[in-house]
């Protein structure tokens, strides 16, 4: 087993499946992923929400960033990139778990990739 991989947490999967998406428009995110021509508004929505909520702990599997995250929108490729410094150390938009500290409670927000939802 590679050092970069770790067992998938089934409890996390179960928790995600029970979410009612209180902070993001779930359908809008799915539209963004399935139709690149409609991605811009959904991408801006995600970017604005992440900025507004002041994310404390970001987990991008298998990498973990415990600091504020910048979101870069690549309009030509129709993808979102998350990085430490305005596009530096970019991570492709594939499988992302965002933990947000909101009103002293931890909210787990997930984003679907074009192939699977996590």
Regions found by a protein language model. Give the residues of each.
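Ribonuclease/tRNase effector modules and their secretory precursors
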Residues: 1-118
